[in-house]
UniProtKB/Swiss-Prot annotation:
Belongs to the ammonium transporter (TC 2.A.49) family. Rh subfamily. GO terms for cellular component: apical plasma membrane; basolateral plasma membrane; cytoplasmic vesicle; plasma membrane. Glycans are attached at N48. Its main location: membrane. It catalyses: NH4(+)(in) = NH4(+)(out); methylamine(out) = methylamine(in); CO2(out) = CO2(in). It is a multi-pass membrane protein. Residues 1-9, 82-85, 145-148, 201-218, 272-281, 325-345, 416-479 are cytoplasmic. N-glycosylated. This is Ammonium transporter Rh type C. It is found in: Cell membrane; Apical cell membrane. It comes from the Eukaryota. It comes from Pan troglodytes. One of its GO terms (biological process) is ammonium transmembrane transport.
Length: 479
């Protein structure tokens, strides 16, 4: 089926409408947190505080790292498609910019409401980035097959569902999920996989040649991998309690990521008959350890435990890219462009299970009495909880997340199937030229619904033949 992909009025109107709504809602509901307000001066004097004690100085370095991961790491990781680099980075930029605004509102209404106002500080910015990271994960499943309008619609609904799921887990079930193995990765992955299943394209084979990478596109994607890999310790520790919890989360993530690289390389080489490495595995499976250690990151997992998690996830993720992704596409009709099930889905579930087991096995000998109370908030509502109770609720949180992702993905997928969102036809998927003005001679797309459009020439422009210069040895020497 061919759809009209001319977005001249639809995209501008959608973007402007959403932004105007954001301006109005921010004007009505959003104010600065007291540490960002000018009244901080009187508060500081009254409580004898120093500017250095402002939350900004504790949290902003982590916020910077998380921000880079969302906009640079995820964006460039998805540039592996040979003709979809503009869209991978550009649409990631678009959905993230809208998503952080909507996330500040949705999370604010659930977590940061004081009176009738949402108070915004640096911690809100980190949480909004976490929410958008989940959207970026889901984007990987539908990459190349949807229009920017569909992505904005998906972002709107996913951020809403993310905030609801996060509230249920963190506020009602009292789950610990510092690095978001459940709330971010599991939810984002299975929401995205459900959406892409609903949007299944029977004739996607017509765009199969564009679904491959080339040398340069893989190199750009590797840049995204390195940014994600380097900053993941900040991601998993960004909102942990100051002091030992945050310190522990960074160490555990660091160790898990390091182990994951070695096992990913080992399995990738072992699965090739000539022992060669597959760049897809190195770009993605090497990050699975950071996903899986997220829930238990601030727990007393021990460095060797983090290494074991990374070791196992490197193996499972690489095997998933080789065997599971083709199976899901051929048997279940799940067209997972980026293989997010192997990088975020399965490692996220592993992370949820590891978090439950680690919480259930917590003891006074390992944590100490005060450390146990502080690490799991065993006070107030949870005053009579035991470690086993915490572990049980961790599992409940994982199950709720999966249910929310699957049900939400079905509903949003059905909305995105409507024919007026400007989605590309099956033969024009994974092609920048559908939505972007391309440099001369860099488009092979054909849009039959636009009679004025003429497909351009070959993707590699012809170069006039030039006689080669003579070799140095053949040039006569002047005596």
């Amino acid at each position: 089926m061919a759809w009209n992909t001319n977005l001249r009025w639809r995209l501008p109107l959608t973007c402007l409408l959403l932004q105007v709504v954001m301006v109005i809602l921010f004007g009505v509901f959003v104010r600065y947190d007291f540490e960002a307000d000018a009244h901080w001066w009187s508060e500081r004097t009254h409580k004898n505080l120093s500017d250095v004690e402002n939350e900004f100085y504790y949290r902003y370095p982590s916020f910077q790292d998380v921000h880079v991961m969302v906009f640079v790491g995820f964006g460039f990781l998805m540039t592996f498609l040979q003709r979809y680099g503009f869209s991978a980075v550009g649409f990631n930029f678009l959905l993230a910019a809208f998503g952080i605004q909507w996330a500040l509102l949705m999370q604010g209404w659930f977590h940061f409401l004081q009176g009738r106002y949402i108070v915004v500080g640096v911690e809100n910015l980190i949480n909004a980035d976490f929410c958008v990271a989940s959207v970026c994960v889901a984007f990987g499943a539908v990459l190349g097959k949807v229009s920017p309008i569909q992505l904005l619609i998906m972002t709107f609904f996913q951020v809403t569902l993310f905030a609801v799921n996060e509230f249920i887990l963190l506020n009602l079930l009292k789950v610990k999920d510092a690095g978001g193995s459940m709330t971010i990765h599991t939810f984002g992955a299975y929401f995205g996989l459900t959406v892409t299943r609903i949007l299944y394209r029977r004739n996607l084979e017509q765009s199969k040649e564009r679904q491959n990478s080339v040398y340069q596109s893989d190199l750009f994607a590797m840049i995204g991998t390195l940014f994600l890999w380097m900053y993941w310790p900040s991601f998993n520790s960004a909102i942990s309690y100051h002091g030992d919890s945050q310190h522990r989360a960074a160490i555990n993530t660091y160790c898990s990521l390091a182990a994951c690289v070695l096992t990913s390389v080992a399995i990738s080489s072992a699965l090739h008959k000539k022992g060669k490495l597959d760049m897809v595995h190195i770009q993605n499976a090497t990050l699975a350890g950071g996903v899986a250690v997220g829930t238990a990151a601030e727990m007393m997992l021990m460095p060797y435990g983090a290494l074991i998690i990374g070791f196992v996830c490197g193996i499972i993720s690489t095997l998933g890219f080789v065997y599971l992704t083709p199976f899901l596409e051929s048997r279940l009709h799940i067209q997972d462009t980026c293989g997010i099930n192997n990088l975020h889905g399965i490692p996220g579930i592993i992370g949820g299970i590891v978090g439950a087991v680690t919480a259930a096995s917590a003891s006074l000998e390992v944590y100490g009495k005060e450390g146990l109370v502080h690490s799991f908030d065993f006070q107030g509502f949870k005053g009579d909880w035991t470690a086993r109770t915490q572990g049980k609720f961790q599992i409940y949180g994982l199950l709720v997340t999966l249910a929310m992702a699957l049900m939400g993905g079905i509903i949003v997928g059905l909305i995105l199937r409507l024919p007026f969102w400007g989605q590309p036809s099956d033969e024009n998927c994974f092609e920048d030229a559908v939505y972007w003005e391309m440099p001369e001679g860099n488009s092979t797309v054909y849009i039959p619904e636009d009679p004025t459009f003429k497909p351009s020439g070959p993707s590699v422009p012809s170069v006039p033949m030039v006689s080669p210069l003579p070799m140095a040895s053949s040039v006569p020497l002047v005596p």
